[in-house]
C-alpha cells in the first residue's frame, strides 16, 4: 500500500494536481478518474499492459505515465470534451489517450495552428 501512496504523491506532483483541479474549465471528477487510472496502471503487477490492442512492457507504460504533466492531462480532457462519437470501453480509450498524449500532443497543436492559419483546403506555402 505504501508503494501506491508513493506513486500517488509523485503523479499528483507531476501533473500539478492542486493547480489543475482549481483551473476553470477542468472537471475535477474527470481529473480524479484520470489520476486513479494512472495510479492503477503504474502500480500494476502485470509484466505486459495492453494499450490500443498492443501489449507493451509494463515498465515502458509506467515510464511514459510517470512523464505525464498538466499539459498532457488538459489535452486529454479537452479532447474528451470535443469527442462526439460513442466510446464503447472508456477505460481502454483513456489508457490509449494517456499513453499516446506525450507523443501526439505537439503534432495535434501544430496541425490545429496550420488549419487556423491557412484554413481547410488551403495549401501551405513551400
Please describe what each predicted stretch is:
Residues 1-126:
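Electrostatic interaction modules used in gene-expression and signaling proteins
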